[in-house]
Structure formats: C-alpha cells, structure tokens
C-alpha cells in the first residue's frame, strides 16, 4: 500500500471516529457536574438528569414506505441509545426522569403493538445504565384532557406507577403533577386521582423541604413572555391546541398547581425546545415567584436542530424552613449534536472525494496518447459512440474501484462504532 493512500485511509478513519464518537461524547463531558456546580462545601448534592420527549419513531409516525420508515427508526433509535448511554456513563446521575412522550403514537397502540414497542424502548433507553429511573406520561402516551384514554392510563400506571406522585430526595420533594389528567373535567376516573393528589399538598404543607415541580405540559404564560436566548424557535410559546394536544395548561389550572405546590422551580417537557420563564402568583397575601424551565427534547426527530437534556443539582443541608430555599437548586442545559448536519457532512465529504477520484481518472485517460486531443486538424480522430461509452464505463469502473479501496476500512469502522456503542 502506498504511503499516500495509507495516510488518506487513516485520515478517513479519524474523520469517522470524530463524527461517530468524539462529537457525541463531548457534550456530556462539557456538562460535567464539577464544571458548573457552585455549591459551598456544606452538604452532598443530589444530581438528577431530566430527559424529555424521546418519542420513539414507530410505524405510524410518518407516511413513508416500510423500508424507509425502518431506516428512520434505526437512525433515531441509534441516536437515543448512544446519548442515553453516554449521559449515564459520563455523568452518573443519582436519578433520571423521563418526562413523558415515550413513544410517538403510543396512545394509539393495541396491547400487542404496545408491548413490542415497550420492549424496544427498554432496549434503547436501557434502565440498567441508570442508578434510579422515574417515568411519567405525556399526551402521546395517554392522550390529553377530556380525551385522555382510561385504558392507556391504566396500562401506563401498571408499568411505571401513579401518574401523579412525590419523591423525597436530598432534603427536597420532587412533585410530579399530571396536568394532562387535571385538564379533564368529564371523567372522574381520569381527573379524581390527580385532583386528590394536588389537594393533599394544599392541605398538608411541610415547608421544611423545598419543592421542585415536574410535569409534562408547561404552565400557562402570556404570549409576550420571552423564553430567553437559548431557544431555537420563536422567542415565545403561544397557547395552542389540537387533536390530543394542548401546549400550555389553562391559566386557572396553572395557578392552582403553583399555589398548591409552591415550588422553588418547575420543569416541563412537551414543547421540544428550551424555554425559561418566571411565573408570579399570590399565595394568600404573599407574593410568590417560580422559574419554569422547558427541557429540550432528547430525540433527533423532534423538529429542532439540537436536541438536549437538563441537569438538576439539589443541595439543601438544612432542616430549617427559614433557610434560603431558592438557592438550593442549580440547573444546566446540555445540548446534543445536530445528527442531520453530521449526515450532511458525510454526504458532502463522500461526494467531493468521489468527484476528485473521477476527475483524476478522467484526466489520466484523456492525457494519454491514445485518448489525447489532436494538436492539428489533420490529426483528428473520429470517436464512435460505442468507443465513448466504453471509455466512460472504464473511467467509472476504475473510479469506483479506487473509491472502495480508500473507503472500505473507514466504512467497517463506521459499522463497528454503530453496532458496538462504546
């Protein structure tokens, strides 16, 4: 093997390694807890990863031919699987929350279809990589409001526990409030458990523990409230609704949740993009304020360029309710790479390299005496159509052979890195 060819192959291997490994592990390393936590030496922080809207692509997601939907499922699953593993291997959070919308059309599935995609999800988002995993539903899992599906709620709770619940950890109470079921007002079987749960916080307030509100659908805010500079799409979230969908809880419900829980911070999913707003409200005669963070979608098929997740660090080493609870949490947005852009880089690189080999091969053939252009008209040769076609086929055949000889090793490396995600 010539030295030049060897160096080109090595360069391609490093290129593949960068696009398949380094570019994917780097965001998680940049989010290392020690790089952004600013706690004093007191206490031992509890570290939490918030993962929103994985929305596994399924057979009903896109109106594509079956082979194409299979490719899209494989690519999107690989992205989720890769970053799920890298997140937990790099950051090792104490608890991981999946904040709803596990599958794209899970609420439409019959039992057998659901089982099939449930096991697929457990393979992609493998719980064995987590220290502790908590999952609650989104509208893609159980429907929304008056159209929430009872059998889907029962199925979800049988697998993952109550859709509204609280978890005490690190001297904090994490309060999962099911705004989807609270938005129902026609079926007591749907709304009553969620209302009872919320009422229990309203009547039995223990202010010694700071509370963090977790939900799927964000709380209501005026359409003029800016989401901040970290958002990709429009600067605001405007109220909207559709089939089994509502992008903000209603104002009255939002206020009742805030008053009942009185959280020091709130986190929601559903919107797919980042948003940070402050909710001001009154509890009795007191003025209160809560910052709500919308967590980016974890999926590459969620309509944003850069998926992500949120880290939450809790540190409240006090039993004194008068201690400063607002400063007991810190949070960090972690942004994942643009997978579509990576495939564009692959496509551009392959196209340019193939074109260069084709050009070099063509120059070689047309530069030889046999195929060179005549210097004088008297030396003109007549090229038949069959000769031209034969020459073209020969150039393409040699170009392909040369291209494969340079790229088969990098291609095997690509396959290896996708089969064995390390």
Swiss-Prot record:
It holds the Pfam family Metallophos. Its main location: endoplasmic reticulum. InterPro entries: Calcineurin-like_PHP_ApaH, Metallo-depent_PP-like, MPP_Cdc1, PGAP5/Cdc1/Ted1. It is found in: Endoplasmic reticulum membrane. Keywords: Endoplasmic reticulum, Membrane, Signal, Transmembrane, Transmembrane helix. It is a multi-pass membrane protein. One of its GO terms (cellular component) is endoplasmic reticulum membrane. Residues 1-19 form the signal peptide. GO terms for biological process: GPI anchor biosynthetic process. One of its GO terms (molecular function) is hydrolase activity. The chain crosses the membrane at residues 339-359, 402-422. Disulfide bonds: none annotated. This is Uncharacterized protein C630.12. The lineage of its organism: Eukaryota, Fungi, Dikarya, Ascomycota, Taphrinomycotina.
